[in-house]
């Protein structure tokens, strides 16, 4: 096998595993030789060889065979001056009597009981681990996520299946994975015998590819169709992967026909996932589809207050000055993970230097985070987006006309300017045809009132906010 052939394989692997995984795990591999059906690689460490063997061997073998290379297993050895100790190879030969597979939540959490008699592919299915921090008790509920939280609670009660599937979608760091883990924990607590399988869509694809290669599709089908609850995270990963979507579709149908619960998460609504087959979209949309909206100020502040109480266990003597949490909730608005990470950094830094967490320390410690989180949305951008959304001219928003069809979008634009920019009310008024600050204040308050009683206005504002912050 030539280096050029391995180079082509690497390019295909890059497309499959993504840039981060490729850079970390595939790029360091140095092909030594292909001989007797064994592809041998040099790796920097035994750990890397073992990790690649467990997580990427299926894909690498698949690509070898697609290229016409009769590779049946991979071997890894550490490049060193001393004699190298080969890493345990990954076998591709079919095993006649594979070991039983543990598929319940109890097994995934490290408990040794509950083995099923389901036969598996040669390697046990590595279900995604559950984070013990992600429970319903630790989930902070606010208006942006209250519906998703209520739906997750209902499913976790484990009674009759009322909506199937439950699809949770939203941007990064809004709580999808937290709710997925919380559901699994609650189901486990209520019924330890329940057969719950939680995994990522990426893991589903890897197991599918392995089953195809080893001609173990019946085992694969039996495994996934014998669960009581199937939970698949980040379903958008299978978009564009036709064979995987085909099997996912049939698995989905089989479980629904058995009245088994399915819970899915995605980074956007099913109908908006590019390259996802229409029939899969249709299936996902036939249950309850719930959006986790971007956090508002009150929810972010509540999350910070909860995290402070949790951090008190490790930092009982630290003090936080008034206004610090409010500053963070106001300035870090797009990603809860960044928000929580900022607070963790603050606690660690203050503890190391022995200082109170005040405004000065916050500005010094989090200068990069606060700078990156500064709002860069302009008044003009908001005016343009709002006029496009309501299909009116930008001059009508700025102009003097007081028709309802112009006045309401104008008030929405003023409200968004107040929320998403640092402009003062008089400055905003000047950008809206020279209006004074009292007019802007009235418009802002009017939209705040309407959001609570008019679902359409609330949806309009949220859609525009997400569009502007994207």
Swiss-Prot record:
SMART domains the UniProt entry points to: AAA, Bac_DnaA_C
GO terms classed as biological process: DNA replication initiation; regulation of DNA replication
Compartments, as annotated in UniProt: Cytoplasm
GO molecular function, one term: DNA replication origin binding
Entry annotated with the keyword DNA-binding: yes
Region (Domain II) residue spans: 79-128
Alphabetized Pfam families for the sequence: Bac_DnaA, Bac_DnaA_C, DnaA_N
Binding locations of ATP: 173, 175-177
Gene3D superfamilies: 1.10.1750.10, 1.10.8.60, 3.30.300.180, P-loop containing nucleotide triphosphate hydrolases
Superkingdom of the organism of origin: Bacteria
Region feature Domain I, interacts with DnaA modulators, mapped onto this chain: 1-79
Protein keywords: ATP-binding, Cytoplasm, DNA replication, DNA-binding, Lipid-binding, Nucleotide-binding
Protease in keyword set: no
Domain III, AAA+ region: annotated span: 129-350
Cellular component GO terms held in the UniProt record: cytoplasm; plasma membrane
InterPro entries assigned to the protein according to its UniProt record, in alphabetical order: AAA+_ATPase, Chromosome_initiator_DnaA, Chromosome_initiator_DnaA-like, Chromosome_initiator_DnaA_CS, DnaA_C, DnaA_dom, DnaA_N_dom, DnaA_N_sf
Transmembrane segments: none
Region spans: Domain IV, binds dsDNA: 351-470
Sequence similarity: Belongs to the DnaA family.
Assembly: Oligomerizes as a right-handed, spiral filament on DNA at oriC.
Record's function text: Plays an essential role in the initiation and regulation of chromosomal replication. ATP-DnaA binds to the origin of replication (oriC) to initiate formation of the DNA replication initiation complex once per cell cycle. Binds the DnaA box (a 9 base pair repeat at the origin) and separates the double-stranded (ds)DNA. Forms a right-handed helical filament on oriC DNA; dsDNA binds to the exterior of the filament while single-stranded (ss)DNA is stabiized in the filament's interior.
Free-text note regarding domains: Domain I is involved in oligomerization and binding regulators, domain II is flexibile and of varying length in different bacteria, domain III forms the AAA+ region, while domain IV binds dsDNA.
Name of the protein in its database record: Chromosomal replication initiator protein DnaA
Organism (species): Ruegeria sp. (strain TM1040) (Silicibacter sp.)
């Amino acid at each position: 096998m030539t280096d050029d052939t391995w180079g082509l394989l690497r390019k295909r692997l890059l497309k499959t595993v993504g840039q981060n995984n490729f850079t970390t795990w595939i790029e360091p591999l140095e092909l030594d030789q292909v001989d007797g059906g064994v592809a041998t690689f040099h790796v920097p460490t035994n750990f890397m060889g073992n990790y690649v063997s467990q997580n990427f061997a299926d894909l690498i073998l698949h690509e070898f065979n697609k290229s016409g290379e009769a590779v049946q297993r991979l071997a890894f050895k550490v490049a060193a001056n001393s004699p190298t100790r080969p890493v345990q190879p990954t076998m591709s030969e079919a095993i006649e009597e594979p070991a039983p597979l543990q598929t319940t939540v109890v097994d995934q959490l490290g408990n040794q009981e509950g083995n099923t008699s389901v036969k598996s592919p040669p390697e046990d299915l590595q279900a995604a681990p559950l984070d013990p921090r992600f429970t319903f008790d630790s989930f902070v509920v606010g208006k942006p996520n209250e519906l998703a939280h209520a739906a997750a609670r209902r499913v976790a009660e484990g009674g009759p299946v009322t909506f199937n599937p439950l699809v949770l979608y939203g941007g990064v760091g809004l709580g999808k994975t937290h709710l997925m883990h919380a559901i699994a924990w609650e189901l486990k607590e209520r019924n330890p015998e329940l057969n719950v399988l939680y995994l990522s869509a990426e893991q589903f694809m890897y197991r599918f590819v392995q089953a195809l290669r080893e001609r173990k599709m019946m085992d694969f089908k039996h495994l996934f169709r014998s669960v009581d609850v199937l939970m698949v995270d980040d379903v958008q990963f299978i978009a564009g992967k036709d064979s995987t979507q085909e099997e996912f579709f049939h698995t989905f149908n089989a479980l629904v026909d058995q009245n088994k619960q399915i819970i899915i998460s995605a980074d956007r609504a099913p109908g908006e996932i590019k390259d996802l087959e229409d029939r899969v979209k249709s299936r996902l949309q036939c249950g309850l589809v719930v959006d986790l909206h971007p956090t508002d100020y009150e929810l972010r502040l509540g999350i910070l207050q909860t995290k402070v109480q949790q951090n008190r266990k490790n930092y009982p003597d630290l003090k936080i000055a008034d206004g610090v949490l409010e500053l963070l909730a106001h300035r870090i608005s797009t990603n809860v993970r960044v928000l929580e990470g900022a607070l963790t950094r603050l606690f660690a830094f203050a503890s190391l230097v022995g200082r109170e967490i005040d405004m000065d320390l916050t500005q010094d410690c989090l200068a990069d985070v606060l700078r990156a989180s500064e709002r860069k949305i302009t008044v003009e951008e908001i005016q343009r987006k709002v006029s496009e959304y309501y299909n009116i001219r930008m001059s009508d928003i700025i102009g003097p006309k007081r028709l309802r069809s112009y006045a309401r979008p104008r008030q929405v634009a003023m409200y968004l300017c107040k929320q998403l920019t640092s402009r003062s009310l008089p400055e905003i008024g000047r950008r809206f045809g020279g209006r004074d600050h009292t007019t802007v204040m009235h418009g802002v308050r009017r939209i705040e009132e309407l959001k609570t009683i008019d679902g359409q206005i609330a949806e309009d504002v949220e859609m525009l906010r997400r569009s502007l912050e994207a």
